[in-house]
UniProtKB/Swiss-Prot annotation:
Tagged with keyword Protein biosynthesis: no
Protein name: ATP synthase subunit beta, chloroplastic
Location in the cell: Plastid, Chloroplast thylakoid membrane
EC number: 7.1.2.2
Family, similarity comment: Belongs to the ATPase alpha/beta chains family.
SUPFAM superfamilies per the UniProt record, alphabetical: C-terminal domain of alpha and beta subunits of F1 ATP synthase, N-terminal domain of alpha and beta subunits of F1 ATP synthase, P-loop containing nucleoside triphosphate hydrolases
Any single GO BP term: proton motive force-driven mitochondrial ATP synthesis
CDD domains in the record: ATP-synt_F1_beta_C, ATP-synt_F1_beta_N, F1-ATPase_beta_CD
Main location as per UniProt: plastid
Amino acid sequence: AFENKLMKNYRFLGISTSSEGYITQIIGPVLDVAFPVGKMPNIFNSFIVKGQNPAGQSINVTCEVQQLLGNNKVRAVAMSATDGLMRGMEVIDTGAPLSVPVGEVTLGRIFNVLGEPVDNMGPVEATAKSPIHKPAPAFMDLETTVSIFETGIKVVDLLAPYRRGGKIGLFGGAGVGKTVLIMELINNIAKAHGGVSVFGGVGERTREGNDLYMEMKESKVINEENISESKVALVYGQMNEPPGARMRVGLTALTMAEYFRDVNKQDVLLFIDNIFRFVQAGSEVSALLGRMPSAVGYQPTLATEMGCLQERITSTKEGSITSIQAVYVPADDLTDPAPATTFAHLDATTVLSRGLAAKGIYPAVDPLDSTSTVLQPWIVGEEHYEVAQGVKQTLQRYKELQDIIAILGLDELSEQDRLLVARARKIERFLSQPFFVAEVFTGSPGKYVSLNETIRGFQNDFTGELDSLPEQA
């Protein structure tokens, strides 16, 4: 009976292709679609709803299959607004997951979750496309040796080094220099490693995405005169997008990064801003699909969804994807399931401090709060490890003395402590450096400092060789 009713609907709609279905229910961004017997799409297949709304405007909505409901029905999540969709509308199964353009043509351009350019600079002549759902690299293909990813930024390389193919959490409020740090990393990976970057804007403010784009053009990270010389591809799925788009935009950015790693054999930087919004979008979709919520209202599949994204970010024998992820901590609660699940995947954390930014020390990376799992003597070497520990001990002691200095003044300290404070203040200044991308704002030429140079410089500072120099030197 169901089949006869279905075929009558098909004849009424004039549908001829066997992979076509029709909408039976719409609840916000979630659609139920009926398909002919034996023509059910697979989970994660994308399908397209085409037609016209009552006002005569054309509709083209891409959806992704999330559940097979039985009775030849599937439940899918829309990747764009569902305004104007009606029951009975025609649905065409593409027979494959969502595929996006990859390769050099993506550099300097802005894409949405579907891989469509949204920067009003014309179509992208893509020679290759890649599906956004893929397995993580096989165990045999992974790079097993742990190596440091040199950034040319002193404070990062010395005290909280990044692992090549690792994941780094970036913590910091508004106005402490997150964007400038991100742009400097994009610039340095292009110059020092011959690599490229992909920036995924996940569920953040559209204004911030626009500001980042404008600043990248100003600092020549995106080259307007010769777009192919740009060093970054941008993929945006901002706050105004439906939850389906925000949940998948991270995978679109990752797919573009994987092509540079696997086919071009390059080192790639993948930025995700903000990884919490990826979890939040997944939570919204989970509720819309009718799943029972887990702890604090999050989706029961939280760890699986996070793992599917994070496990694809790694070093292989061909190249590497090193990921820097901005992490929003809701209500500053580190035990919240979203940040707690993220922390399990991170190799390092870079914490930006408002106090250092207020002193005018940039990059405002907090040397004591930032951490790294690769700061071990058998990975970075004894010399690097000892210098880093010495710098941290000096800064920690300075932090402990700050209350005494504030109440009694510097003169009440012992001779040894006064010397330590002088060294700590020099170290604090020495941890700052001018950035290439900030040249247009500061007028100071940028500096890329190699790791060996950084270690040697701090060794001199911390052994007392520079005690005779003033702090400003």
